[in-house]
Swiss-Prot record:
It comes from the Bacteria. It catalyses: L-aspartate + H(+) = beta-alanine + CO2. Binds 1 pyruvoyl group covalently per subunit. Heterooctamer of four alpha and four beta subunits. InterPro entries: Asp_de-COase-like_dom_sf, Asp_decarbox. Keywords: Autocatalytic cleavage, Cytoplasm, Decarboxylase, Lyase, Pantothenate biosynthesis, Pyruvate, Schiff base, Zymogen. Its EC number is 4.1.1.11. It comes from Chlorobaculum parvum (strain DSM 263 / NCIMB 8327) (Chlorobium vibrioforme subsp. thiosulfatophilum). Its cofactor is pyruvate. Its main location: cytoplasm. This is Aspartate 1-decarboxylase. Pathway: Cofactor biosynthesis; (R)-pantothenate biosynthesis; beta-alanine from L-aspartate: step 1/1.
Length: 128
């Protein structure tokens, strides 16, 4: 039996734009994806801290350095530009591996610049 564990989280990201006409997804700056150990097409759970909305979508890789967090398609109705969100990716693993698993947490500022990251239970690595 496998369990679903938090793999990575981008905490307190700010939605920069939305595109209702796009087919769906969330566009995330490539650098943030690398720092958070996330990748294009990966399924994510997004939580809107402003209204409590929770939704699943998949990642599209954005341009490095633009600090873009864009919601596309129906997801654009779940959060507005300026809303604070949490983006979480999960992984399946055996219970033995899960017991020692430490997810990657990335904290960003109000401009989506990465400020620090750490694995749960480990020291912070300050960025920028």
């Amino acid at each position: 039996m496998k369990v679903h564990m938090l793999k990575s989280k981008i905490h307190n990201a700010i939605v920069t734009s939305g595109d209702l006409e796009y087919e769906g997804s969330i566009t995330i700056d490539k650098e943030l994806l690398e720092i958070a150990d996330m990748m294009a097409n990966e399924k994510v759970l997004v939580v809107n801290n402003n209204n409590g909305e929770r939704f699943e979508t998949y990642i599209i890789e954005g341009t490095r350095g633009l600090r873009e967090i864009q919601l596309n398609g129906a997801a654009a109705r779940c959060a507005l530009p300026g809303d604070e969100i949490i983006i979480m990716a999960f992984a399946e693993m055996e219970p033995e591996e899960a017991r020692n698993w430490q997810p990657m947490i990335v904290i960003v500022d109000r401009m989506n610049n990465p400020k620090r990251r750490h694995r749960v239970g480990k020291d912070n690595e300050y960025l920028g």
